[in-house]
């Protein structure tokens, strides 16, 4: 677990006032004006109700002291009662109304966060800092009680306390000024202690996030059915439990340190409270006994002194709470403003045209993953000619998938350039560049949606005839026709109880149909038949030329026999093109490709003999 000192000294990028301006801007742009109007009205009504409650008893007592008529007494009681009922009703109404504005702002920020994750540059998904900020942004807005929405609650409470502070200050203006200063001074010290604790929590947030992330991962492994068979067959239960318990012990140690700090802050606050209230009460008792202060006035000042201290403490405590929330929202803002290494809307437009030949070229390209000690791809020069069927083969770790990611624009080289028709791809809108490619990747994803939606990758405007054609080319027509709702059958049971589970081979065929439906100029197939049996695999190979007609194709495979139909084969080793040519040429050369092919052929011969 990373808990280095460099993690504990991080400062927030934005302060309280910058975050307040930012949140007001989000609310204004979203036209959620009720957070201003209703929030301010609610603060006034809440403070007004508290002031009315303070004045109620002294007013009644004053009527009795002056010996006024019963009617006057009933009028005072009735007037205050009606006022309190009205203010209570209005407070409840405004509180409910205020929920919608706060929630709408939170939803807007959640939407911005979701769009950031879905549309961010691919390298950011490999960046630990980005992923950590993403997780924290999720936590800051996941419920109504988290910082993104609670921010408005805190500001409402601060305004309420400010209004109350002003009113009570007027009431106490006739008392000793030193008493008011004592109340303010002790409250400020209490606030500073509270703020110090909040800053401790922020400084150690990376440590806490590490424990939470690790616990969440262990919980996922323990409860996800994907791991269920492995846990049972390999007897991993005790190991998973020990991992959970050891991490929980570390997390408990962190919580103990944090709660100890909070305890000392509370002890200081309690001591200051005793000094503050004790001095106020002693002074009022002295005024009553020595100066003849009326009982009604004593009751009023007694309540005002207590309330004044609470208003001051409330202002400072709510600011401390708001400060902590702003630390969380600062993280959200940092996430939303995380720099994008790729150009998107600000890039040059690139139109996908099927009648335009596209040449891809790598010019002196090297790529090294963050934190790696050596290049995965090193000083590689490569030209993919228009309409060429190119195979990329090699052992695990040779750089095949990384090379494809560079060609597809998911990664920018750490050295060199990727060129499209002789032009560097970096100035282009990367999303336009992605439109040139259709792909079946090793780590494919299936949506909890219908068969048609998975193939077309959209919900409206689906060309069903084209979907069926692509399913037929991928060899999945018979399976889909056997499903209860055919194209409208839901895939997976994560969302829909009546969804169907496809086998690994069937899922791979579905992904192939999806790539064919896109009809892009460049088709990328990264181990597209890894989950297929030999007969099904051969069926795909027989249709390969038909599927790639008029397109440039990149075919990545471990099985060298599957590359016979390609125009050219690249044999990668240690991030370089070690050999290049057709299947027959490489076999005649007798190099690494031929050796690997012989090993694989021997395996298949032994299997057939068996």
Predicted regions and their residues:
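Helix-to-loop junction immediately C-terminal to a conserved catalytic motif
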Residues: 408
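Membrane-integrated ABC transporters
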Residues: 1-50, 70-75, 130-166, 214-216, ...
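Transmembrane helix-loop-helix hairpins at lipid-water interfaces of multipass membrane proteins
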Residues: 36-93, 169-201, 275-282, 286-296, ...
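Cytosolic ends of transmembrane helices, especially the final helix of ABC transmembrane type-1 domains
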Residues: 236, 280, 299-337
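Primarily ABC-family ATPase nucleotide-binding module
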Residues: 233, 336-388, 469, 546-549
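Extended non-transmembrane interhelical loops and adjacent amphipathic helices
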Residues: 1-21, 103-149, 211-254, 326-339, ...
């Amino acid at each position: 677990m990373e808990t280095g000192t460099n993690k504990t000294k991080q400062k927030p990028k934005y302060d309280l006032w910058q975050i307040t301006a930012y949140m007001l801007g989000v609310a204004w742009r979203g036209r959620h004006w009720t957070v201003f109007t209703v929030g301010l009205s609610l603060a006034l009504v809440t403070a007004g109700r508290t002031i009315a409650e303070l004045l109620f008893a002294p007013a009644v007592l004053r009527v009795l002291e002056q010996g006024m008529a019963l009617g006057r007494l009933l009028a005072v009681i009735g007037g205050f009662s009606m006022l309190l009922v009205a203010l209570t009703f209005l407070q409840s109404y405004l509180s409910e109304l205020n929920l919608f504005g706060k929630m709408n702002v939170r939803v807007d920020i959640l939407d911005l966060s979701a769009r950031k994750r879905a549309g961010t540059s691919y390298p950011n998904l490999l960046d630990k800092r980005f992923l950590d900020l993403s997780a924290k942004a999720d936590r800051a807005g996941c419920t109504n009680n988290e910082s993104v929405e609670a921010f408005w609650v805190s500001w409402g409470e601060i305004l309420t306390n400010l209004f109350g502070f002003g009113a009570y200050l007027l009431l106490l203006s006739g008392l000793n000024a030193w008493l008011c200063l004592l109340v303010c001074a002790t409250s400020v010290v209490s606030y500073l202690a509270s703020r110090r604790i909040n800053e401790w929590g922020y400084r150690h947030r990376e440590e806490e996030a590490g424990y939470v992330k690790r616990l969440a991962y262990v919980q996922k492994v323990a409860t996800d059915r994907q791991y269920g068979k492995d846990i049972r067959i390999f007897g991993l239960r005790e190991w998973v439990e020990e991992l959970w318990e050891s991490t929980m012990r570390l997390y408990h140690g962190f919580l103990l340190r944090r709660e100890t700090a909070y305890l000392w802050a509370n002890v200081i606050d309690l001591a200051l409270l005793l000094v503050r209230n004790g001095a106020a009460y002693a002074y009022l008792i002295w005024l009553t006994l020595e100066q003849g202060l009326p009982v009604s006035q004593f009751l009023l000042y007694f309540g005002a002194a207590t309330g004044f201290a609470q208003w001051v403490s409330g202002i400072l405590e709510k600011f401390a709470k708001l400060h902590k929330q702003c630390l969380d929202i600062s993280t959200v803002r940092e996430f939303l403003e995380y720099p994008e290494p790729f150009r998107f809307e600000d890039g040059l437009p690139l139109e996908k045209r099927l009648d335009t030949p596209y040449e891809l070229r790598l010019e002196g390209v090297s790529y090294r993953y963050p934190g790696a000690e050596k290049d995965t791809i090193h000083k590689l020069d490569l030209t993919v000619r228009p309409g060429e069927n190119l195979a990329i083969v090699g052992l695990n770790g040779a750089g095949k998938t990384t090379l494809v990611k560079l060609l597809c624009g998911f990664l920018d080289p750490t050295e060199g350039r990727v060129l499209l028709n002789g032009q560097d791809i970096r100035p282009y809108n990367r999303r336009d560049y992605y439109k040139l490619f259709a792909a079946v990747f090793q780590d494919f994803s299936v949506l909890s949606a219908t068969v048609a939606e998975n193939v077309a990758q959209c919900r409206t405007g689906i060309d069903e005839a084209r979907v069926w054609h692509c399913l037929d080319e991928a060899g999945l027509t018979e399976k889909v026709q056997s499903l209860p709702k055919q194209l409208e059958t839901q895939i997976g049971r994560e969302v829909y109880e009546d969804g169907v589970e496809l086998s690994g081979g069937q899922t791979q065929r579905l992904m192939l149909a999806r790539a064919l439906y896109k009809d892009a100029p460049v088709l990328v197939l990264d181990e597209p038949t890894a989950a297929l049996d030999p007969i099904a695999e051969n069926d795909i190979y027989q249709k390969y030329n038909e599927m790639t007609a008029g397109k440039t194709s990149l075919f990545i495979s471990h099985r060298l026999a599957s590359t016979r139909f390609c125009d050219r084969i690249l044999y990668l080793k240690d991030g370089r093109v070690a050999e290049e040519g057709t299947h027959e040429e490489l076999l005649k050369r007798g190099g690494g490709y031929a050796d690997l092919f012989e090993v694989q052929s021997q395996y298949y011969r032994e299997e057939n003999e068996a």
